[in-house]
Swiss-Prot record:
Keywords: ATP-binding, Cytoplasm, Kinase, Magnesium, Metal-binding, Nucleotide biosynthesis, Nucleotide-binding, Transferase. Involved in the biosynthesis of the central metabolite phospho-alpha-D-ribosyl-1-pyrophosphate (PRPP) via the transfer of pyrophosphoryl group from ATP to 1-hydroxyl of ribose-5-phosphate (Rib-5-P). It comes from Clostridium acetobutylicum (strain ATCC 824 / DSM 792 / JCM 1419 / IAM 19013 / LMG 5710 / NBRC 13948 / NRRL B-527 / VKM B-1787 / 2291 / W). D-ribose 5-phosphate binds at residues 200, 224, 228-232. The gene is prs. Mg(2+) 2 binds at residue 175. This is Ribose-phosphate pyrophosphokinase. Homohexamer. Belongs to the ribose-phosphate pyrophosphokinase family. Class I subfamily.
Length: 319
């Protein structure tokens, strides 16, 4: 797939090696030879077992459970590649951790999303490739280029293929903050939108206040960037059914699915939950209601474009 004067290398940490291998396979290269383990005291140990001098290097490491271990692996590997004289280092981070801590919601709180950006840059990244940041303005926390991919085209294409007649569809934003994403999704389906007005009295707890829009007799599709404990999405689905929606599905980019999420989804009125695999969804999380779509093709195409110095934004124009 790639034919260029520079030498490309793809490496991965331990957070999601199967995704890195899928991306590398599409590009037509092998994942680089490295070992990431632990010293006896729990510190992260990294060995890079091949030369990377002068290469265009892409380190694929999503930031998922155990989150802080994933972060330390990323930072230490970036440092190793920088000290080994890699020509250009792109940190490929499908899911960017601490993205919800992007501002001071109350006094004396940290802005950890900014701290993360500083750490990644200082460790050695020359560029970042990520997908659906919880707050897009996090791109401005970096002093290096950030290529920000969107999950909406992949998710919308799935629902278009599943619904030959989109006349009875309505796309629903689970909160005011997600309206822009929901509108993009709805435009692809040529469907109207509705908005759920909710309040969040404390973290991971939400209450539906009202629904803006007519969902009666419609097939509703809830669109979010992330499903964590699934409280918000399940509350929204229950409210939509109560308001007369004949069917409710949900989709998101990042399936964190922590704590009671799986049990809540199982017991919810949701017909289907479509999730992109920016985070591994394995074992007990692979319930019948959950449909997982791969992000490997879009990341492979973005890596190809970065490597060949082509515009990444054209990916979305070609969708």
């Amino acid at each position: 797939m790639i034919n260029h004067g520079k030498n490309i290398k793809i490496f991965t940490g331990n957070s999601y090696p199967s995704l890195a291998e899928e991306i590398a396979d599409i590009i037509g290269v092998q994942v680089g030879d490295s070992r990431v383990g632990k010293f006896s005291n729990g510190e992260t140990a990294v060995d890079i077992n091949e030369t990377v001098r002068g290469t265009d290097l892409f380190l694929i490491q999503t930031l998922c459970e155990p989150v802080n271990d994933s972060i330390m692996e990323l930072l230490i590997m970036l440092d190793a590649f920088k000290r080994a004289s890699a020509g250009r280092i792109t940190a490929v981070i499908p899911n960017y951790a601490y993205a919800r801590q992007d501002r001071k919601a109350k006094a004396r709180q940290p802005i950890t999303a900014k701290l993360m950006a500083d750490l990644i840059h200082t460790a050695g990244a020359d560029r970042v490739l990520t997908m659906d940041l919880h707050a897009p303005q996090i791109q401005g926390f970096f002093d290096i280029p950030v290529d920000h991919l969107e999950g909406v085209p992949i998710l919308a294409k799935y629902f278009i293929n599943q619904n030959s007649n989109t006349d009875d569809l309505i796309v629903v934003s689970p909160d005011i903050g997600g309206v822009k994403r929901t509108r993009k999704f709805a435009e692809k389906l040529h469907a109207p939108i509705a908005i759920i007005d909710k309040r969040r009295p404390k973290p991971n707890v939400s209450e539906v206040m009202s629904i803006i829009g007519d969902v009666k007799g419609k097939k509703a599709i809830l669109v979010d960037d992330m499903i964590d404990t699934a409280g918000s999405i399940v509350n929204a689905a229950e409210a939509l059914v109560k308001m007369g929606a004949k069917e409710v599905s949900a989709c998101c980019t990042h399936g964190v699915l922590s704590g009671p999420a799986i049990e809540r989804l199982e017991n919810s009125p949701l017909k289907e939950v479509v999730i992109l695999n920016t985070i591994p969804i394995e074992g007990d999380k692979r319930i019948d209601k959950i449909k997982v779509l791969s992000v490997a093709p879009i990341f492979a195409e973005a890596i190809r474009r970065i490597y060949e110095d082509m515009p990444v934004s054209k990916i979305f124009q070609e969708e």
